[in-house]
């Protein structure tokens, strides 16, 4: 069996995910998304008309054959926990399949909140060891992408690595937000710097840097040993990017895995898709791209479905109002339970149970679930948070000064509207 595994990639693709456990780091606050994450963790933020951001990492695990998953939570975890309990409870424990929720909790040493990404795993080592996995896949729960982790596991084993880091080129002006690495001809990582002020460029491309995606594969025993050493290091910040990966790099045990090798794409000629929707503009832009004629991310790929909690909702409905005006939409995503009455929706994303009343014009907007838009409103280049009631005649996205005074307006001109902001303006939020 061992000999067959070494020579047969198909056998490796089947066996390695079974021998692995995935740990999804889902405790991030996502402060750059402003008020959108005041009451929910970033992985629980809505995306793409019906999903949550964490659904992408979870779906990648399932589609890759990894059915032992731990989700490490911390900040504002209730919404996230509720979503996973409702939408991801189909695993068969008798077949050793599960999604374990691992919240931050008081332990013997007195820690409560996780001190860093590595500490989030360290504090749960007693539970993780019980999984008896040979490989541990560490994932961020707040990125949008499709990846076959079994291909990364194969790469890890074939290179004889103790740690493998997924990477991709990014524009050098954006590289300061990532861990940046240099590799040799065998893709061994020879240098790793976390979020450098002056990121080094790639040898063959001075305009780009080779960035870590925060996706790691470890030999399990090696990871546990590293984490125990790091836990006892008073000078450590207990973070994978700042402490663990540089230490492994110095030991010559870390290898890079180019993301294009495992990125799942319907069109092999397209650019590999991976987004950190950590700012309001990036979030708005990534949502609206899904409504374009040919989106960069294919959500209709039946061979790599993105799963989520599916509510029992009626179909979306477009109706005439009493004046005879038709509800119309163009280049938009409109989810179940929506009703558009005598209004026009263009290049927008409407999540479930959104109601747009008569004489409205919605353009380049993202409306989260249960938003109610009163008559004669104009909404443009905005994100409307869940269950907001937009009063009759309100105009958003046309006057920069007024938008900044009433709501949050980003430097790029994207407006975020929440229930609390509307209440401060004197608008009731109960229908």
From Swiss-Prot:
Q: Which residues cross the membrane?
A: none
Carries keyword Transferase? Answer: yes
- What EC identifiers does the entry list? 2.7.7.27
Activity regulation, free text: Allosterically activated by fructose-1,6-bisphosphate (F16BP) and inhibited by AMP.
Tell me what organism the protein belongs to: Escherichia fergusonii (strain ATCC 35469 / DSM 13698 / CCUG 18766 / IAM 14443 / JCM 21226 / LMG 7866 / NBRC 102419 / NCTC 12128 / CDC 0568-73)
Its keywords, alphabetically, are: Allosteric enzyme, ATP-binding, Carbohydrate metabolism, Glycogen biosynthesis, Glycogen metabolism, Nucleotide-binding, Nucleotidyltransferase, Transferase
Q: Which one of the record's GO molecular function terms can you name?
A: glucose-1-phosphate adenylyltransferase activity
Site (Could play a key role in the communication between the regulatory and the substrate sites): which residue positions? Answer: 74, 113
Give the protein's biological function: Involved in the biosynthesis of ADP-glucose, a building block required for the elongation reactions to produce glycogen. Catalyzes the reaction between ATP and alpha-D-glucose 1-phosphate (G1P) to produce pyrophosphate and ADP-Glc.
* Taxonomic lineage from the root: Bacteria, Pseudomonadati, Pseudomonadota, Gammaproteobacteria, Enterobacterales
Biochemical pathway: Glycan biosynthesis; glycogen biosynthesis
Q: What is this protein called?
A: Glucose-1-phosphate adenylyltransferase
Q: Which HAMAP family match?
A: GlgC
Q: How does it assemble?
A: Homotetramer.
Q: Give the catalytic activity.
A: alpha-D-glucose 1-phosphate + ATP + H(+) = ADP-alpha-D-glucose + diphosphate
Q: Where does alpha-D-glucose 1-phosphate bind?
A: 114, 179, 194-195, 212
At which positions is AMP bound? 40, 46, 52, 130, 370, 386
- Which enzyme class? transferase
Q: Which family does it belong to?
A: Belongs to the bacterial/plant glucose-1-phosphate adenylyltransferase family.
Name the positions where beta-D-fructose 1,6-bisphosphate binds: 39, 419-423, 429-431
